[in-house]
Amino acid sequence: MAQSINITELNLPQLEMLKNQLDQEVEFLSTSIAQLKVVQTKYVEAKDCLNVLNKSNEGKELLVPLTSSMYVPGKLHDVEHVLIDVGTGYYVEKTAEDAKDFFKRKIDFLTKQMEKIQPALQEKHAMKQAVMEMMSQKIQQLTALGAAQATVKA
């Protein structure tokens, strides 16, 4: 369980350390959301590609990717079944409708995960902003104190 810290009681170096920690946490959460969005986009594209699988496209010629920049000609033979990469080199054969349902579930799951992370990211941003404001206040206090001491010495 996280403990509560009163940032007004922290000195400038401690505030700097806290700010750096919050920077790292914000970066981690932002990266996590970005990675989830990349995977979600992949699933959305895969689901959308299933729309070309209909009887009118059966037998049509297409380009089959061997790499991201190399293709070979092919024909669309079976428009009712697809192989889905389920990870770690495993593929599962599904009907086009089952594949759409599979991708929809994956997209929904990723959306929920991003929705769980978003509030934490916003909270960390707000905490970082509060720390930065407190740092600014402390710097202003130190500057004013230094100016007052310089005036007294003069």
UniProtKB/Swiss-Prot annotation:
A single GO CC term for this protein reads: intermediate filament cytoskeleton
Q: Name one GO molecular function term.
A: unfolded protein binding
Q: Which UniProt keywords apply?
A: Acetylation, Chaperone, Nucleus, Phosphoprotein
The Gene Ontology biological process annotation of the record reads:
negative regulation of amyloid fibril formation; negative regulation of canonical Wnt signaling pathway; negative regulation of DNA-templated transcription; protein folding; retina development in camera-type eye
Record Pfam families? Prefoldin
Q: SUPFAM superfamilies, per this entry?
A: Prefoldin
At which residues is N-acetylalanine found?
Answer: 2
Indicate where the modification N6-acetyllysine is found in the sequence. Answer: 42
Cellular compartments annotated: Nucleus
Q: Which residues carry this modification: Phosphoserine?
A: 56
Q: Does the keyword Metal-binding apply?
A: no
Q: What is its main location?
A: nucleus
What does this protein's UniProt record list under function? Binds specifically to cytosolic chaperonin (c-CPN) and transfers target proteins to it. Binds to nascent polypeptide chain and promotes folding in an environment in which there are many competing pathways for nonnative proteins. Represses the transcriptional activity of MYC.
Tell me how this protein assembles.
Answer: Heterohexamer of two PFD-alpha type and four PFD-beta type subunits.
* Name of this protein: Prefoldin subunit 5
Instruction: Give the species this sequence originates from.
Output: Mus musculus (Mouse)
Q: What is the lineage of its organism?
A: Eukaryota, Metazoa, Chordata, Craniata, Vertebrata
Q: Which gene encodes it?
A: Pfdn5
